[in-house]
């Protein structure tokens, strides 16, 4: 059987495991009810600045 030549730290182990999850999970988006643009869930819309029906940030110009 194969044996490890040196101890692998938890940090190195977790960095290696993170690569699999980064590649397999697709970005989840929802449609903003105010402007109809796709945005991340539970966050203010990057296009119009609305969250839960309220204006929370200024309008951002996305180039």
Curated annotation (Swiss-Prot):
<dbReference type="GO" id="GO:0006412">
    <property type="term" value="P:translation"/>
</dbReference>
<feature type="region of interest" description="Disordered">
    <location>
        <begin position="1"/>
        <end position="20"/>
    </location>
</feature>
<keyword id="KW-0689">Ribosomal protein</keyword>
<dbReference type="InterPro" id="IPR002677">
    <property type="entry name" value="Ribosomal_bL32"/>
</dbReference>
<feature type="compositionally biased region" description="Basic residues">
    <location>
        <begin position="7"/>
        <end position="18"/>
    </location>
</feature>
<dbReference type="Pfam" id="PF01783">
    <property type="entry name" value="Ribosomal_L32p"/>
</dbReference>
<dbReference type="InterPro" id="IPR011332">
    <property type="entry name" value="Ribosomal_zn-bd"/>
</dbReference>
<dbReference type="GO" id="GO:0003735">
    <property type="term" value="F:structural constituent of ribosome"/>
</dbReference>
<dbReference type="InterPro" id="IPR044957">
    <property type="entry name" value="Ribosomal_bL32_bact"/>
</dbReference>
<protein>
    <recommendedName>
        <fullName>Large ribosomal subunit protein bL32</fullName>
    </recommendedName>
</protein>
<keyword id="KW-0687">Ribonucleoprotein</keyword>
<comment type="similarity">
    <text>Belongs to the bacterial ribosomal protein bL32 family.</text>
</comment>
<dbReference type="GO" id="GO:0015934">
    <property type="term" value="C:large ribosomal subunit"/>
</dbReference>
């Amino acid at each position: 059987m194969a044996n490890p030549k040196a101890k692998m730290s938890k940090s190195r182990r977790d960095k290696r495991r993170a690569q699999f999850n980064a590649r397999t999970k697709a970005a989840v988006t929802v449609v903003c009810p105010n402007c109809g643009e796709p945005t991340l869930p539970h966050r203010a819309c990057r296009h119009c600045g609305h969250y839960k029906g309220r204006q929370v940030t200024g309008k951002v110009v996305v180039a």
